Amino acid sequence: RSVVDKQVVNVVSRGFGVIALRDEVDTAVFLVHQNDPVPVSVEERFYTVADDQDTIKVRVFEQGGAEESPRPEDNTILVEGEITDLPPGYPRGTEITMRMSMGGDGILTVTAHHVARLEPLKLVVETGQAMNAAEVAAERDAVNLLKRNL
């Protein structure tokens, strides 16, 4: 594409997700992917792994290398939290709704909701992985300058 066609879009520089148990193995599940435009908001459903599960551990990670990897050890845990003291009576496979969002400020917000709770677990972390408004404006100015000089 020529410079005339270029646009500056703020994107996520690394992927983010949660560690989930898949086929009895901890797996890094990406919800936000590298180069997704910001703001971004993604919702995915996960499920409890046992009847009467009383705790849900939420581990949020950042992509550790150039490529997405499902191996937890290839990624960097940013923040952890738990939904605790869940009452008995919920079967294996009870839905947990996970929402992950990031604005142009690079702040990642993750909520995890189990039906037994009125309020979701909320985790917030400053990632530094998005350009701020001043950086986006500077990039736009640079592209506009190139366009004018063609």
Language model segments and positions:
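Acidic low-complexity intrinsically disordered segments
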Residues: 1-150
